């Protein structure tokens, strides 16, 4: 009999209750909140800023993927299969046929989008993931006022 513990499981975000509606998720993750608190401190400088931003976005994209993307049931013959025919893992994993696009808005900083893209190409089929780039700049009038 195949292992069934990982079939049809329910994934739940660690969330704070709120009245913003079902499409808003306020994460209650002590690791992410600790990293965010550290990032906000004025004494934190480069290269730690980049490391924290990268780590935070990596965790956020994994959380979003786990909560929002569809799953499919799969069976995997493990490395132990040569020793026993019972060495088959069966469970729900990410649907590898999902398509994804990340948009890099250069004015807002490129690192978050790059982290999302790199994470998605490792979790999904790379040919199903695309990264688009949008370049933006402020426009000022003759007096230097942003318009």
What are these regions (language model features)?
Residues 1-147:
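PRPP-associated nucleotide enzymes
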């Amino acid at each position: 009999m195949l292992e069934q513990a990982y079939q049809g499981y329910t994934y739940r975000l660690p969330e704070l209750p709120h009245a913003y509606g079902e499409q808003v998720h306020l994460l209650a993750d002590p690791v992410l909140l600790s990293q965010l608190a550290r990032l906000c401190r004025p004494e934190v400088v480069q290269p730690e800023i980049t490391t924290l931003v990268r780590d935070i976005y990596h965790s956020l994209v994994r959380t979003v993927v786990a909560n929002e993307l569809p799953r499919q049931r799969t069976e995997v013959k493990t490395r132990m299969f040569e020793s026993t025919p019972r060495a088959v893992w069966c469970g729900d994993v990410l649907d590898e046929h999902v398509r994804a696009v990340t948009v890099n808005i250069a004015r807002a900083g490129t690192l978050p989008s790059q982290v999302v893209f790199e994470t998605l190409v490792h979790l999904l089929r790379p040919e199903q993931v695309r990264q688009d780039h949008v370049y933006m700049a402020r426009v000022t009038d003759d007096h230097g006022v942003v318009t």
